[in-house]
Curated annotation (Swiss-Prot):
Source lineage: Eukaryota, Viridiplantae, Streptophyta, Embryophyta, Tracheophyta
Protein name in UniProt: Actin-related protein 6
Biological processes annotated in GO: cell division; chromatin remodeling; defense response; negative regulation of flower development; regulation of DNA-templated transcription; response to osmotic stress; response to temperature stimulus; seed germination
InterPro entries linked: Actin (IPR004000), ATPase_NBD (IPR043129)
Species for this entry: Oryza sativa subsp. japonica (Rice)
Ranges of compositional bias, category Basic and acidic residues: 275-293
Record region (Disordered): 272-293
Amino acid sequence: MTGGSGVVVLDNGGGLLKAGFGGDMNPTAVVPNCMAKPPGSKKWLVADQLQAQDVDVTGMTLRRPIDRGYLINQEVQREVWERVIRNLLQVDPNNSSLLLVEPQFNPPALQHATDELVFEELGFKSLCVADAPSLVHLYEASRQPSLFRAQCSLVVDCGFSFTHASPVLQNFTLNYAVRRMDLGGKALTNYLKELISYRSLNVMDETLLIDDAKEKLCFVSLDVPGDLRLARLSSNDNPFRCSYILPDGITYKKGFVKDLDEACRYSSLPANGESVRKDSSDSDRSKFEDKKKPELSQNEFVLTNERFLVPEMLFHPIDLGMNQAGLAECIVRAIQACHPHLQPVLFERIILTGGSTLFPRFTERLEKELRPLVPDDYQVKIIAQEDPILGAWRGGSLLAHRPDFESMCITKSEYEEMGSMRCRRRFFH
């Protein structure tokens, strides 16, 4: 894909906002979709300003425009979009079209609020709206045309606010068959905050730090009972034990993993959860190194079984008191809601997208959970995207680069003449 398009492609995620130009392979900006204010400061930091190396994210007050997947704060969203469009992309909306990735089942009132923001406050000349599953399917079909000759797939989007299993046929999402779990990256971060606060330090106000710790340290277990047994071992023999250092505001302003090798020890374990034996020299060395380790300070916390119990929410939420089906059951229900002729094809084309699918071993665990629920004569094939955070944006970039793209858009003059509801009919929402 090559650049040069006058179309701004905006994937307005609840956690990260991805923005760039139609025809480009990668977005120009991938920034937090929020505003934050440091303790004792009156200045709000917006989007990319939170990513600066000299910014201490400890104890920040957050304001997010998106809650549970939907736009709830138009003022914050305008601030973020203004920052991204004018400062990072450096474009004039009056001379640009916008392709916006919008959440599924967006209520009409929120569609109208979005259109107001796009046309009246930012002044884009035209707008096209698409949902994430159809764009993810479009991108994967362009990469592997032979695999997607049937023109259908099941897109599993494990995002920041929710998880959707969405069948797609000929680039249209089959809304009647979509199944949703009210679990996403935000819920996992909140659960990790609760576990750490109960067992170690009070980190309930450290959303950005714990989000970073979750992304760097959590993984999906292939054998939860076996891993729980290993997690009870002493510190030297515990393959899951690792420390996360909190910023002190002076020496370092970002949190980090204390020992990356220690954090990756679990990856050498066999899948059946058996402990890896150590010879005497390894044991002696570990004892010697353990003596050299400093005592746990107020600026760090230790994780053990939390590392795999947090992602476990996605597979067995009922074990944690949530009255919801797990991810595998959600996928099966979505496929079973489709025509019987589509079902075997969908099981062979399950696409994983969204940041929560980046946990190590996610794909293997999902296949292990899914196989017993699928008829024996059906094949199960799971496609993990190379960069699941950018999947929807890249599909949008492809769509925006098509010659007929402008015919899919509603223009500002059409919006002013007919209003939001009549214009929206063009998008089949």
